[in-house]
Amino acid sequence: MARYEDLPYRTCVGVMLINAKGLVFIGRRAGGIEHIDDTHVWQMPQGGVDPGEDTWAAAKRELYEETSVRSVERLGEVPDWLIYDIPRTVAGRAWKGRYRGQRQKWFAVRFTGKDSEINVENPGGGHKAEFVSWRWEPMKNLPGLIIPFKRPVYERVVKEFSALAEE
């Protein structure tokens, strides 16, 4: 097995889905290897980029696969790739031990549909549910709801997209 320091980062995308009131979609994770406590179980949709896939296409696909949402308008993109490391204690189990963390490209999108379009229990494309529930949350609260090792990424995403938040 490769040393933790030598492992690559998994290439991923993240999506900040913002409603007409400026609130952000967050989903309560269904558990998984990263689950460390019951207070930091919320996150925005995110997932891997397929080989040869454009990051914007990947963002729309991941959003659909996790929320069933297709009614969006692109608002912005964080210019840099944001990186986080997963704790060494779970690195051997997460992603079959192939990655030390993720490098993410983040997009902000306006939700133009109705809340009834959102379905996290039976998401689009027949994919396994990653969330067990969801809610709209003020953007400024997001870093405090995410698992601690992802917090710096969320702080940067909130900073980049803060002008899109509710008044």
Swiss-Prot record:
Q: Does the keyword Hydrolase apply?
A: yes
Which molecular-function annotations from GO does this UniProt entry contain? bis(5'-adenosyl)-pentaphosphatase activity; guanosine-3',5'-bis(diphosphate) 3'-diphosphatase activity
Coordinates of motif Nudix box in the sequence?
Answer: 47-68
Q: Where is the Nudix hydrolase domain?
A: 8-159
Enzyme category, top tier: hydrolase
Mind listing the UniProt keywords for this protein, alphabetically? Answer: Hydrolase
**Under which EC number(s) is this enzyme classified?**
3.6.1.-
Q: Does the record's keyword annotation contain Hydrolase?
A: yes
User: Which Gene Ontology terms describe the biological processes this protein takes part in?
Assistant: nucleoside phosphate metabolic process; ribose phosphate metabolic process
- Cofactors demanded by this protein: a divalent metal cation
Classification via CDD domains: NUDIX_Ap4A_hydrolase_plant_like
Q: What does this protein do?
A: Accelerates the degradation of transcripts by removing pyrophosphate from the 5'-end of triphosphorylated RNA, leading to a more labile monophosphorylated state that can stimulate subsequent ribonuclease cleavage.
The family classification in the record reads:
Belongs to the Nudix hydrolase family. RppH subfamily.
**Protein name, as recorded:** RNA pyrophosphohydrolase
Gene name, please?
rppH
